[in-house]
Amino acid sequence: MKAAVYLGKEQLVVQDVPDPTLADGEVLLQIHACSVCGTDLRTFRHGDKKIIPPRILGHEFCATVVESRAPDANVKVGDRVVMYIVIVDGRDRYVEMGRENLTAHRTTMSYHHDGAFAPLMRVPAPAVRQGNLFKITSNISHEHMSLAEPLGCCMNAHSRLGIGLKDTVAVIGAGPIGMMHATLARLQGAQKVIVLDNNPARLEMAKRFDIDAALLVQADGSHREQVRALTEGFGSDVTIVAVSAAPAQNDALEIAAKAGRVNFFAGLPKSNPIAPLDVNHIHYKELVISGSYSEKKSDFQAAFALLHSGRFPADKFITHTLPLERINEAFPLMENGVALKVCVLPLVNGH
């Protein structure tokens, strides 16, 4: 079969690889759609020490079970599925807390096991035993269901933000993750949702969503005053940083209202993770700061249920689809703000 194989920095090559074969307890999936994640882009541009080449990438997917050597699995041949991609291989305090994303005893699809930028993907036996495959029972499209994984990551952040009816929410970053945060905030009843970005093209796409303002980040910092003007001078009750940039983290502290909640959803590059922050904002405004990394299984379940409900506007997120052979075209589309979410269709041939 053809697969998109990561060979190292700036090397994602579509090449022939053997079809996967199953051991006892494993399941084989036929991949219908796999969305390109920001981490795929980051891995392509900068590499990732956790990924040992050669590795088939892709972890945001929708598929059908085509073979099973797991008679006790919660899914069967013919079922359409999505997958919680964190596989626990031990137990510690975090697993006991239901925070599988934080345990050191885990592996992940696309990092430690071959992923879904291919027509077929093998699901390891531990993932099958742990019930990581979720059967789709609605007629929602393959492309839309591929959003379950990134949406679950956003759910993880929202689980600790407590967004309510009187809250103003500011999201810094108008990429697909930022717009998922903005959409979730509105679904949770936020009275005002403000999105900020330094890319005008992204802000134009953001205006297609149910938000109150799309603000261009300015070098002189005037966007901060715009946030205050939109919030009667108070600032944002909840601020989510959905972009990997230290200035955005500082902006979040600046625009946060007193007693506000701030979530650093996006981390900084490991090569330069230190940010100069005015921590007096945290002290004097009594801010509550949280981080967010990956997702718990409960977050994925919540995202799965939301997509199933039809209440999430998945159609606004998938702006481009590509056959597997053209996967490398996704990266400049994402970087330039032309695309919001690019979905790769491994079963579609063509150039």
Task: Describe these PLM feature segments.
Residues N199, L268, E295:
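Residues in the short beta-alpha loop(s) of Rossmann-like NAD(P)-binding domains
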Residues P20-C34, G47-R93, N101, T137:
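Glycine-rich beta-strand-centered segment in the early N-terminal region that forms part
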Residues M1-F61, M121-G131, L347-H351:
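Short N-terminal strand-loop motif that marks the start
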Residues L161-G162, E204, F209-E286, G350-H351:
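Glycine-rich cofactor phosphate-binding loops and adjacent beta1-alpha1 units
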Residues D89-I172:
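NAD(P)H dinucleotide-binding glycine-rich loop of Rossmann-like/cofactor-binding domains
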Residues R80, T168, G260-R261, V288:
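Short glycine-centered segments of the SAM/dcSAM-binding site in methyltransferase folds
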Residues S138-A219:
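Mid-domain Rossmann-like dinucleotide-binding core that forms the NAD(H)/NADP(H) cofactor-binding site
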Residues N250-E254, K296-H351:
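C-terminal hydrophobic helical "lid"/dimerization subdomain
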